[in-house]
Amino acid sequence: MTADLFWNIIEDYNRQTWIYQAALMGALVFGFILSLKKRAQWFLKITLGVANIFIGTVFFLYYGTEPIQHYFAAPLFLAIGALFILEGIRYSDDEFGPLSPLQWSLLALVTLYPLVSFLLGNTFPRMVVYIMPCPIVSFSIVLYSGYKRKNIVLLVLLTLWGLTGIKSFFFNALEDIILLMCGIYCARCVVSEIGKWKRAGIKES
């Protein structure tokens, strides 16, 4: 995929779906506030699930033009979304927060996505906004890391997309350096969870 085609897809997607994006972003903010207040902490996971499924079906299956979007990216986001919804339903009592200084810092960086895209010379609709693949995965990584319970399969899937932030240097989308940072952090979370499993196994033996 060329950089020009990449930005053309973004432009069409933003122009035609902005109202749905606004609704999803409002739900994410609401879910985050609920979680901070220790109320209905499952709602944020469900909303992240819906947002990832929206990206998989709408951004990649409907607006996508390349095989890699249809056969890799779309299934990946659909799987991430399904796991988030399953987590929200099955572990509805899972506790959120408090976030660490590092998590707050990463969250602050993710909220800067549109501003960074604008400062790099992009304007709406040809710019990166929140309800897009890379910002959504970045939000998903940071917010999911705030929960006590972690699904390592979900973390691995999030890491897979997070590390694609390296493409920021090839598609002139330098704002996706934020995604790369979140991907590296998520990889660290995976290693941490594996370490917990090993320690638990040693204690049991």
Language-model features and meaning:
Residues 1-68:
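N-terminal topogenic module of multi-pass integral membrane proteins
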Residues 39-49, 97-106, 146-157:
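Membrane-interfacial loop-to-transmembrane alpha-helix junctions, especially the N-terminal start
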Residues 50-55, 76-84, 135-143, 162-164, ...:
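Alpha-helical transmembrane segments and their membrane-interface exit regions
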Residues 50-58, 108-118, 158-170:
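Aromatic-anchored segments of alpha-helical transmembrane domains
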Residues 62-66, 144-156, 161-176:
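Membrane-helix boundary connector in multi-pass membrane proteins
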Residues 69-74, 170-183:
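Loop-to-transmembrane alpha-helix initiation sites
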Residues 70-142:
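Membrane-proximal helix-loop-helix units in multi-pass membrane proteins
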Residues 89-94, 190-204:
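Membrane-interface capping segments at transmembrane-helix boundaries
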